[in-house]
C-alpha cells in the first residue's frame, strides 16, 4: 500500500481517480484549492490548499510515497487569459516539485503538444505546441525528465464523459459539448471537421494511473483509446442520441490542432486497455441532460474559460459584483 497525494484531486479527473486509488488499497490524501467546487464531499482526507503555497504543501509531500500531480490551469483559452499566472501554476510548481519531492511522480501532460501533423505520432514524434497550454505542458515534461527521469508522464488524449457523481463535469470538451448542443439546442456547428483528435474516456485516466502508483515504469506515454475526426464524432453523437442537426462551417477556426496519436507503447509496455468508450461518454452526458442534471449550457461552471475569467481577469468584472477569489489567483492575477 502506498500513501498517495493527489494534488488538484477535486476536479474532473481527480474524482474517479481518487475512488479507484482507494479501491486499490492505497491511502489517499487530496490537496486542492476548490477553485471550481464549494466543498469536498468524498470520504478521504482532504486539505484545502494552493499549489503556489509551497510552505503549506511541503509537509504533505513529506507524507506521500507517490504524488499524482493533476493541478493545472487546463485548456487553451483558459490559459491564454493570463500567461503569467499560467506559467507559475503549470510550469514553476513542477520545477519546485522535482527539487523538493523524492518519491514517485506521476504527471498528466497532453497530446496537444503534437499540434498539427498529418502523421500517426508516437512518443518520439515531432512536437509542435500551438498554444500556451501545450507549451507549458511540454516545458513541464522537460523539467521532469531532466530533474526526475524516474517519473511517469502520460500525454492525455482529449477527454470525454463523466467521472464520478460528485465532481464538476467539463462541458467544454468536444464530445461533451456536442452532446449538450445536440440535446439542448438541436444544432451542432462543426468548423472544418476533418481535423483529427485522439480521444479517451475520463475514467480511463485512472485505469492507466492506478496500477502504476507503486510501480517503477518511467518515461513518456501517449494515453488514449481512438482517433477520429470532429465531423465523424458529431455524426456519431447525432445518431446515438437521436437529436441535433450538423452544420459544417468552412471558415478558419482558431483551434488549428490536427493530429493522430499511436497508443501502442502504453498498451505493450504498461498493459493499458481502455475500459470505456466514446460511445459510453456520449450516453453518460445524454443521460445527465435527459434527467435534468444539465439544463443551462450557458452556466460558467461547465467551462474552464468562463469559470476562470473572474479570477484571472479581475479587471473585467463589473463594479459592485463580488466574487470568491482563491488567494493564489487573486494574489498573482495582475497585468497580463
Role assignments for model-derived ranges:
Residues 43-53:
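Rossmann-fold cofactor-recognition segment
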Residues 185, 190-336:
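C-terminal substrate-binding subdomain of Rossmann-fold SDR/epimerase-dehydratase oxidoreductases
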Residues 69, 95-132, 152:
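Conserved Rossmann-fold NAD(P)-dependent oxidoreductase catalytic core, especially the SDR/UDP-sugar
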Residues 79, 157-167, 174-200, 222:
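A conserved pocket-lining segment of Rossmann-fold NAD(P)-dependent short-chain dehydrogenase/reductase
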Residues 51-89:
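NAD(P)H-binding glycine-rich loop region in Rossmannoid oxidoreductase-like domains
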Residues 52, 81, 85-96, 127, ...:
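Glycine-rich NAD(P)-binding loop of the Rossmann-fold in SDR/ketoreductase-type enzymes
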Residues 5-23:
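N-terminal Rossmann NAD(P)H-binding glycine-rich loop of SDR-like oxidoreductase domains
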Amino acid at each position: 500500500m502506498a500513501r498517495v497525494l493527489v494534488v488538484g484531486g477535486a476536479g474532473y479527473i481527480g474524482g474517479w481517480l481518487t475512488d479507484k486509488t482507494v479501491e486499490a488499497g492505497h491511502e489517499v490524501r487530496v490537496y486542492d484549492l476548490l477553485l471550481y467546487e464549494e466543498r469536498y464531499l468524498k470520504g478521504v482526507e482532504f486539505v484545502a490548499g494552493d499549489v503556489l503555497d509551497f510552505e503549506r504543501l511541503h509537509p504533505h509531500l513529506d507524507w506521500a510515497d507517490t504524488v499524482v500531480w493533476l493541478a493545472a490551469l487546463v485548456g487553451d483559452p483558459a490559459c491564454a487569459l493570463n500567461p503569467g499566472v499560467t506559467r507559475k501554476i503549470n510550469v514553476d510548481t513542477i520545477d519546485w516539485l522535482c527539487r523538493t519531492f523524492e518519491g514517485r511522480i506521476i504527471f498528466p501532460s497532453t497530446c496537444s503538444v503534437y499540434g498539427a501533423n498529418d502523421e500517426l505520432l508516437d512518443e518520439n514524434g515531432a512536437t509542435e505546441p500551438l498554444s500556451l497550454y501545450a507549451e507549458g505542458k511540454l516545458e513541464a515534461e522537460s523539467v521532469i525528465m531532466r530533474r526526475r527521469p524516474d517519473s511517469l508522464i502520460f500525454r492525455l488524449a482529449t477527454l470525454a464523459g463523466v467521472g464520478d457523481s460528485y465532481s464538476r463535469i467539463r462541458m467544454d470538451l468536444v464530445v461533451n459539448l456536442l452532446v449538450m448542443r445536440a440535446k439542448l439546442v438541436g444544432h451542432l456547428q462543426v468548423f472544418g471537421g476533418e481535423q483529427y483528435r485522439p480521444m479517451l474516456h475520463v475514467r480511463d485516466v485512472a485505469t492507466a494511473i492506478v496500477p502504476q502508483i507503486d510501480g517503477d515504469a518511467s518515461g513518456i506515454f501517449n494515453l488514449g483509446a481512438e482517433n477520429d475526426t470532429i465531423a465523424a464524432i458529431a455524426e456519431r453523437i447525432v445518431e446515438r442520441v437521436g437529436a441535433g442537426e450538423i452544420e459544417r462551417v468552412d471558415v478558419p477556426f482558431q483551434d488549428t490542432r490536427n493530429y493522430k496519436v499511436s497508443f501502442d507503447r502504453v498498451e505493450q509496455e504498461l498493459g493499458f486497455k481502455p475500459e470505456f468508450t466514446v460511445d459510453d461518454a456520449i450516453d453518460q452526458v445524454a443521460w445527465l441532460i435527459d434527467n435534468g442534471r444539465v439544463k443551462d449550457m450557458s452556466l460558467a461552471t461547465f467551462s474552464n474559460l468562463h469559470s476562470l475569467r473572474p479570477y484571472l481577469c479581475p479587471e473585467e468584472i463589473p463594479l459592485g459584483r463580488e466574487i470568491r477569489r482563491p488567494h493564489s489567483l487573486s494574489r498573482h492575477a495582475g497585468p497580463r
